[in-house]
């Protein structure tokens, strides 16, 4: 296995070190290459993501990312120049966000309900393609547009992936959109789910408007198994899903090229948290969860399950104990 590591900014290097510690414990001998990308490189060279680095990243099986972002860099420079560019260059058309409430983790929802679903979010289309513009900027007559781009090809490949995941899970898929208002894009998504669903007669299909889905995520999260949705709605509901499962500090994600032509990238959802960087108190659990996603994607299902069980055991027993970053990694690695 060839792994590219982008530790990034803030607490990124700290949590990534613990994730790699767990990876080495469960799958020894991984060939690792670290890339210095983020604020430090930007300040030193003016570069964000050189073409040569993109070419090198393509030669790896997967990418492990820590966190990107620093207040010393103008907002959007690293996000667009690094994260979004990687997404489009490597065709990460699926953003995978598991949502599970682990034993021992408190949910803001009363009764700590059973929560275990996954959101399959389209990652390269929708309103995030940069298709828009503005005229008469700064005047009372300013007009600004953002065009949501949805292609039959792009929608179908994400929907097909979601059905495959539903078949391997509890065989239930929910399309989340807003078809009553976004009739053109919504119609494409709805028709595609109906068409692809014909090949999956064992998977039950449901539809919810995005506003209703946010309500049910709070009042009845157990109804969801696999959610498939577009880029914008997915961006919003995945953070809500993380919140009801204990917060983004326990949320992992995968940015996936389902064709496997390019390496997929796995990362904790949390940010770089520069205010606590270097103090050794950042929680690396989400980064370690990202390792489980990475291993599963690469077909190392037994190793992925071992990491997940070790994380579950750690969360079930740590309670309110405050642990150093390295202590968390060592505990989880020892439980493998």
From Swiss-Prot:
Query: Taxonomically, which superkingdom?
Result: Bacteria
Cofactors that this protein relies on: Mg(2+); Mn(2+)
**CC annotations in GO:** cytoplasm
Which coarse location class applies to the principal site listed for this UniProt protein? Answer: cytoplasm
Report the catalytic activity: (2R,3S)-3-isopropylmalate + NAD(+) = 4-methyl-2-oxopentanoate + CO2 + NADH
Note the site residues: Important for catalysis.
128, 178
Which compartments is it annotated to reside in?
A: Cytoplasm
Q: Kindly state which keywords UniProt assigns to this record, in alphabetical order.
A: Amino-acid biosynthesis, Branched-chain amino acid biosynthesis, Cytoplasm, Leucine biosynthesis, Magnesium, Manganese, Metal-binding, NAD, Oxidoreductase
Q: What class of enzyme is it?
A: oxidoreductase
Q: Does the record carry DNA repair as a key word?
A: no
> Pfam families under this entry?
Iso_dh (PF00180)
Q: Name one GO molecular function term.
A: 3-isopropylmalate dehydrogenase activity
Where Mg(2+) is bound, by residue? 211, 235, 239
Q: What InterPro entries does this protein's entry cite?
A: ICDH/IPMDH, IsoCit/isopropylmalate_DH_CS, IsoPropMal-DH-like_dom, LeuB_actb
Q: What is the similarity comment for this entry?
A: Belongs to the isocitrate and isopropylmalate dehydrogenases family. LeuB type 2 subfamily.
State the oligomer form and interacting partners: Homodimer.
Cited NCBIfam families: PRK03437.1
State what protein this is by name. Answer: 3-isopropylmalate dehydrogenase
* Gene that specifies this protein: leuB
